[in-house]
Swiss-Prot record:
UniProt GO cellular component terms: cytoplasm
Function noted in UniProt: Reversibly transfers an adenylyl group from ATP to 4'-phosphopantetheine, yielding dephospho-CoA (dPCoA) and pyrophosphate.
Gene of this entry: coaD
Species, as recorded: Shewanella sp. (strain W3-18-1)
Residues marked Transition state stabilizer (site): 18
Protein name: Phosphopantetheine adenylyltransferase
MF term (GO), any: ATP binding
UniProt family annotation: Belongs to the bacterial CoaD family.
Length: 163
């Protein structure tokens, strides 16, 4: 276990599926950097600073996990972090084609950077940040899909605090 890995994503917000993969990656690698992307093509509900703070709170129990916001190319961020592995999650076959293209592009840009794919636990296989936000936006209970810190942050952000 000598390898430094990066688990990149938008994490808007972090879900139980993300946490499942982070916990498993933390067992596989010496150090895991959660790279929270400031992706200008997406319009996140939470600011980069809010996402970094939420992910820090949710992963505080993992000693070998660090949370860092970044912008720019992922391969450049990986070099800065001295990481040799990208951890990516595959929820369904529909994720595979995009992830396959992304892995090949990253390999072209940085031949020493390997992509490793983890599948979520069955109970998390359908959870996505987009679905969680949609349920929360319509007043649904998302507590079974996200950490209590995230439930509270979503309620505050969406002004759906219930009495």
């Amino acid at each position: 276990m000598h390898t430094r890995a990066i688990y990149p994503g938008t994490f808007d917000p972090i879900t139980n599926g993300h946490v499942d993969l982070i916990e498993r990656a933390a067992k596989l690698f010496k150090h895991v950097t959660i790279g929270i992307a400031a992706n200008p093509s997406k319009q996140p509900r939470f600011t980069l600073e809010e996402r970094v703070e939420l992910v820090n709170r949710v992963t505080a129990h993992l000693d070998n996990v660090e949370v860092v916001g970044f912008s720019g190319l992922l391969v450049d961020f990986a070099k800065e972090q001295k990481a040799s592995v990208l951890v990516r999650g595959l929820r369904a076959v529909s994720d595979f084609e995009y992830e396959f293209q992304l892995a090949n592009m990253n390999r072209r840009l940085s031949p020493d950077l390997e992509s490793v794919f983890l599948t979520p636990a069955e109970e998390n296989s359908f959870i996505s940040s987009t679905l969680v936000k949609e349920v929360a936006l319509h007043g649904g209970d998302v507590s079974q899909f996200v950490h209590p810190e995230v439930t509270a942050a979503l309620a505050a952000k969406l002004k759906l605090v219930k009495p």
